[in-house]
């Protein structure tokens, strides 16, 4: 059964997570030939300049960008970049909104008052970006690959390969472009210390199952995901079917019992009635799992556990893990 599910994951995840975005790059999308190396390849990017020193040339996913001075007017093109700059104490002058109706993550809302939108991640308003006179644009090859020539003509532009599981490498790249590499390293050191503290608070080694309900999809998340990286950093094991170097395994309501684990954490990307969560969670197969019978299945916030994509979101996930699993 495990081998079968893993094979299914490789094919099911072949649909581009660039979605219907014609400006994206499918090679680095889920199932693309460059997906699984995005973290190691991103780690090779950045600048050789001394910390905080400008001018500097930053190597990134689409080439090299020279920054003559420390940026002060930054525009971010996705929620990952938004979390990154805010985690460094920098408020962007403009931001692209997610395609989802939910908009920007609510956990960042108090820091975004007055920050204008520049379109959505897949439908940028280049005129609005130009009008804000940025001196740095942060985005990704996955989302805006084909717009890079136009964006880089507006302002120096630095692209990561893709959001998601390379979130720590992306954060260091953003810190490099902003001349905040020392602070970025400290933020990640503090994050790992927090993860170690969470691990110390948990008795034993419970296997953690991750279930996400989406419109037309039901996913069990693997290691190459934002939340998968966090669980690995904490040192918590995964059920065999999810302990894979893939974004996720796709199952069906009829095979939901493959989600069994010592603890099950689940969320819905959208309204539970629309994603199938309400029906599945009320059904007999869900109720038949031991974790559910014994009260060890817990609903969590989708926007932090699956959409956070940066250090601030990751810190909130750690808080959740400690609250739900700690002594």
Short names for language-model regions:
Residues 131-139, 156, 261-264:
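Proline-aspartate-enriched helix->loop->beta-strand connector
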Residues 64, 146-215, 311-327:
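Extracytoplasmic substrate-binding proteins
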Residues 220-249:
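Alpha-helical, coiled-coil/dimerization segments enriched in small aliphatic residues
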Residues 73, 79-128:
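A short, structured surface patch at a secondary-structure boundary
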Residues 100-105, 144-146, 161-173, 207-229, ...:
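Extracytoplasmic ligand-binding site segments that recognize negatively charged/polar headgroups
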Residues 62, 118-126, 245-252:
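Short helix-initiation/N-cap motifs at beta->coil->alpha
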Residues 1-79, 183-208, 270-278, 300, ...:
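Bacterial Sec-exported substrate-binding components of ABC uptake systems
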């Amino acid at each position: 059964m495990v081998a079968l599910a893993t094979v299914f994951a490789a094919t099911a995840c072949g649909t581009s997570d660039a979605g219907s975005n014609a400006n994206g790059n499918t090679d680095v999308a889920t199932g693309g030939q460059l997906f699984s190396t995005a973290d190691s390849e991103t780690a090779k990017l950045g600048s050789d300049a001394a910390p905080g020193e400008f001018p500097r040339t930053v190597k990134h996913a689409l080439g090299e960008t020279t920054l003559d001075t420390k940026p002060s007017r930054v525009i971010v093109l996705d929620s990952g970049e938004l979390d990154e700059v805010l985690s460094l104490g920098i408020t962007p002058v403009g931001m692209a909104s997610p395609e989802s109706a939910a908009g920007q993550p609510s956990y960042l809302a108090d820091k975004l008052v007055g920050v204008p939108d520049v379109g959505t991640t897949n439908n940028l308003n280049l005129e609005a970006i130009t009008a804000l006179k940025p001196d740095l644009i942060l985005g990704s090859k996955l989302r805006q690959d084909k717009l890079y020539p136009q964006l880089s003509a507006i302002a120096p532009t630095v692209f990561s390969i893709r959001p998601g599981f390379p979130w720590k490498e992306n954060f260091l790249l953003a810190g490099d472009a902003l001349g905040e590499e020392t602070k970025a390293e400290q933020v990640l050191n503090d994050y790992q210390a927090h993860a170690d503290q969470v691990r110390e608070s948990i008795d034993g080694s419970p296997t953690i199952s991750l279930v996400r309900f989406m419109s037309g999809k039901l996913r069990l998340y693997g290691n190459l995901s934002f939340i998968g990286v966090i669980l690995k950093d904490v040192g918590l094991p995964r059920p065999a079917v999810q302990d894979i170097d893939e974004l996720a395994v796709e199952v069906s309501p009829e095979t939901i019992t493959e989600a069994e684990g010592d603890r099950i954490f689940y969320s819905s990307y959208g309204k539970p009635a629309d994603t199938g969560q309400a029906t599945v969670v009320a059904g007999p197969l869900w109720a038949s799992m031991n974790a559910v019978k014994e009260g060890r299945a817990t609903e969590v916030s989708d926007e932090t556990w699956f959409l956070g994509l940066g250090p601030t979101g990751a810190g909130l996930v750690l808080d959740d893990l400690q609250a739900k699993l700690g002594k």
